[in-house]
From Swiss-Prot:
This is Chaperone protein ClpB. Residues 3-145 form the Clp R domain. The keyword Transport does not apply. GO terms for molecular function: ATP binding; ATP hydrolysis activity. It comes from Staphylococcus aureus (strain MRSA252).
């Protein structure tokens, strides 16, 4: 027995047989040990053949184990188990060797062991019974005319079934979603496949536009016989390149697998069309020192027309891999797959609607499909239709399905309340005082009411769930019947087709309508139901908002109120700048109502004015109002961009420079957070060439970064602040605080001297901030003191400042040329520092209120007014 004349699988089975003998303490390797090991081998051909012959493999394996247990085990020292081969096991190998010669093979393989076991082993004979001829046929089919010329022949057996999937068969079994549209591309593919030579189309398009769907559409047409005669008997196999490469342990094993696949395709005489998704992976696949890659192995067959192949890849990968190999490129014919428009996407979604309804057990409204196409096109800019729209619908269905499986919010709240009351009840039962007894009585009454409410809600939920389950079951039956109708029509089974089309399907549709009507009558409108089973455009909007951070869902009442009073909210934080506040809040309201220009940012403003009048504060307060946090503001200090080359930091370093992979500070921030306030602070400090980058943002709402990716700025508010013309404003402002026309012209003259006309012309508005008046200062004092009180709240201390003291603070700190900042410093010196000293010295208890007054000497006095109990 020469172990080197056996395949790796047989060698592995013998090794496992030795281990089995050691476990059973047997000196000899028995035939059952070898056969049990062969049956349990990973990816066992022995097991695979028996399973296809409908042999009970588990029972056969148990029979082998039982037989092994009947052999006498040997106990003792220095006994070597599994060192010898039994007479019957030796006969098995000898007989297998004779089968090897009969098949004209070079190595003993698993099928030889199986044939030998069928002749020699009584246990195997008993289970195989009268299926010997069936097994012989299966072995013949699996081998496919191949000879065992290597120690790993299994890779050559049924290579296509192992490393690919039959798309035509999947269509017949109804496993594939329908393909809607793409008729021109499918026809183009069919034309190329019908050529004599170079009949290999390659589908090129962006990720998610439907390249794989075109091949699935071709498979569906083949099943429906809606193809030219030359393609009627064809089948489409999708090659799984990762499976082809995975587990190829030995040198040349990958090439052997690929050759086996290509041999099957070639021997099919053009009946098999090979589909290779991500075909660029062929270039370089399996490449080792001195070995050919997969691409070079395909070239001869492609050129001769022996291999019918459809490839699919993206534009970038085609350029990077295929175009570089011109010999491979010329053997393929390009089919460009463009992104469908919104109307085509809606048609595709309508075609898929029923499949998703049946899978998720929900109802999808048509307006949800329209919203998915339109919103994904407008807001999800880094992906392509129809993929992103289909994902939206799928996610929305999954969301509703998840909600259906859990308790509604109303019932959940009641359950929590009941649990809370029960815990309180058990605690009060241990108390003996009158107050506790009184509370216990009240609590038990409330608990009884809550339990009654809980039972009613639970009953209603169960009823709705039962009716929804009936609807889901009926929809699934209808879907199965429609699939059966397609199969019957394809197979020309007219009697069955007529029965389904005119009997079963109309009856199921009628029953489904009745169930839906009853459900509608009993449960009322969708909004009245405890459990929602309908996907609407609101769910689609919510998911777009989750993915992008852009609020596109319908306005809820709280948000509606917030938007209508946005200017009031901003006025509380920004004092004395009514025009600026109104302009910014109006821009946000226009955008949220959906009537802004969809190709430009929400708003772009240039704020001009002296320092400390609220330019930056307005941007911060806007971010806080819209997003409940100032962190959503992208702040770029333009004083960092004083050099001409600093523009690369905004959009990213060019190729070859350090930091190219990191992206730009502005572009990456907006890509991560497309709905935000962008504050370009102190723009006059930046180099003038930096503003050329802003031209595209302000006009088209987009910017291309250093990697060539387009970043969407259409949902941002761009605010620039500058001190240009502030001296003119300070010198010429009226006593009322109004800015005169001549002052405005003088400021604009200063502005035109600094900014290019094309920048200024693209701004929505240039807003002049007026210097702060004495009246404004008193309001700012209130604001500063409110913030101080918020900080003191943590220590349970509060401060009250008299009106006289407030007026004095505003008057003393008033410096028009510096705005509100001197006031903040003045309050720090006059109130915060003395207060801090008192707190450290005296250590106020919680609940202390400190009153600040102004005495006759114009000095502030601090008195501890009261202590709350």
């Amino acid at each position: 027995m020469d172990i080197n004349k056996m395949t790796y699988a047989v060698q592995s089975a013998l090794q496992q047989a030795v281990e089995l003998s050691q476990q059973h303490k047997l000196q000899n390797i028995e035939i059952e040990a070898i056969l049990s090991a062969a049956l349990n081998e990973s990816e066992s051909l022995y097991k695979s053949i028996l399973e296809r012959a409908n042999i009970e493999v588990d029972q056969l394996n148990k029979a082998y184990e039982d037989k092994l247990n009947t052999y006498a085990s040997v106990e003792g020292d220095n006994i070597q188990y599994g060192q010898y081969i039994s007479q019957q096991a030796n006969q098995l190998i000898t007989k297998a060797e004779s089968y090897m010669k009969e098949y004209e093979d070079e190595y003993i393989s698993m099928e030889h062991i199986l044939r030998s076991a069928m002749d020699i082993d009584q246990t195997t004979k008993h289970y195989i019974n009268n299926k010997v001829e069936v097994i012989k046929e299966i072995i013949k089919k699996v081998r496919g005319g191949n000879h065992v010329t290597s120690q790993n022949p299994e890779v050559n057996y049924e290579a296509l079934a192992k490393y690919g999937r039959d798309l035509v068969e999947e269509v017949r079994q109804g496993k594939m979603d329908p393909v809607i549209g793409r008729d021109e591309e499918i026809r183009n593919t069919i034309r190329i496949l019908s050529r004599k030579t170079k009949n290999n189309p390659v589908l090129i398009g962006e990720p998610g536009v439907g390249k794989t769907a075109i091949v699935e559409g071709l498979a569906q047409r083949i099943v429906k016989k809606d193809v030219p005669e030359s393609l009627l008997d064809k089948t489409v196999f999708e090659l799984d390149l990762s499976a082809l490469v995975a587990g190829a342990k030995y040198r040349g094993e990958f090439e052997e697998r690929l050759k086996a696949v290509l041999k099957e395709v070639k021997e099919s005489d053009g009946r098999i069309i090979l589909f290779i998704d991500e075909i660029h992976m062929l270039v370089g696949a399996g490449k080792t020192d001195g070995a050919m890659d997969a691409g070079n192995m395909l070239k001869p067959m492609l050129a001769r027309g022996e291999l019918h192949c459809i490839g699919a890849t993206t534009l970038n990968e085609y350029r990077e891999y295929i175009e570089k190999d011109s010999a491979l490129e010329r053997r393929f014919q390009k089919v460009a797959v463009s992104e469908p428009d919104v109307e085509d996407t809606i048609s595709i979604l309508r075609g898929l609607k029923e499949r998703y309804e049946v899978y998720h057990g929900v109802r999808i409204q048509d307006r949800a499909l329209v919203a998915a196409a339109e919103l994904s096109d407008r807001y999800i800019t880094d992906r392509f239709l129809p993929d992103k729209a289909i994902d939206l619908v799928d996610q929305a269905c999954a969301t509703i399905r998840t909600e259906m499986g859990s308790n509604p919010t109303e019932l959940d709240q009641v359950n929590r309340r009941v649990m809370q009351l029960e815990i309180e009840e058990s605690a009060l039962k241990n108390e003996s005082d009158n107050a506790s007894k009184q509370r216990l009585q009240e609590l038990q009454e409330e608990l009884a009411n809550e339990k009654e409410k809980q039972a009613a809600l639970q009953s209603r939920v169960e009823s709705e769930k039962e009716k929804i389950a009936n609807l889901q079951e009926k929809r699934a039956q209808l879907d199965e019947s429609r699939q059966a109708l397609e199969d019957a029509q394809t197979n020309n089974n007219l009697e069955k087709a007529a029965e389904l089309q005119y009997g079963t399907i109309p009856q199921l549709e009628k029953e489904l309508r009745e169930l839906e009507d009853n459900f509608q009558d009993e449960q009322g409108e969708d909004s009245d139901r405890m459990i929602r089973e309908v996907v609407t455009d609101e769910e689609i909007g919510d998911i777009v908002s989750q993915w992008t951070g852009i609020p596109v869902s319908k306005l809820v009442e709280t948000e509606r109120e917030k938007l209508l009073h946005l200017s009031d909210i901003l006025h509380k934080r920004v004092v004395g700048q009514d025009k600026a506040v109104d302009l910014v809040s109006d821009a946000v309201v226009r955008a949220r109502a959906g009537i802004k220009d969809p190709n430009r940012p929400i708003g772009s403003f240039l704020f001009l004015g002296p320092t400390g009048v609220g330019k930056t504060e307005l941007a911060k307060s806007l971010a806080a109002s819209l997003f409940d946090s100032e962190k959503h503001m992208i702040r770029i200090d333009m004083s960092e961009y004083m050099e001409k080359h600093a523009v690369s930091r905004l959009i990213g370093a060019p190729p070859g420079y350090i930091g190219h992979d990191e992206g730009g500070q502005l572009t990456e921030a907006v890509r991560r957070n497309p709905y935000s306030v962008i504050l370009l602070d102190e723009v006059e400090k930046a180099h003038t060439d930096v503003f050329n980058v802003l031209l595209q943002i302000l006009d088209e709402g987009r910017l291309t970064d250093s990697k060539g990716r387009s970043v969407d700025f259409k949902n941002t508010i761009i605010i620039m602040t500058s001190n240009i013309g502030s001296q003119v404003l300070l010198e010429n402002v009226k006593e009322t605080g109004e800015i005169t026309e001549s002052t405005e012209k003088a400021v604009m003259t200063s502005l035109n001297a600094y900014f290019k006309p094309e920048i200024l012309n693209r701004m929505d508005d240039i807003v002049l901030f007026k210097p702060l008046s004495i009246d404004d200062m008193s309001m700012i004092v209130d604001k500063i003191l409110t913030q101080l009180n918020i900080r003191l709240l943590e220590q349970r201390i509060s401060i009250e400042v008299s009106d006289d003291a407030k007026a004095w603070l505003g008057q003393e700190a008033y410096e028009p040329q510096y705005g509100a900042r001197p006031l903040k410093r003045f309050v720090q010196r006059q109130i915060e520092t003395p207060l801090a000293r008192m707190m450290i010295k005296e250590g106020f208890p919680e609940g202390t209120t400190i009153k600040v007054n102004l005495n006759s000497d114009n000095n502030l006095t601090f008195n501890v007014e009261k202590i709350h109990e």
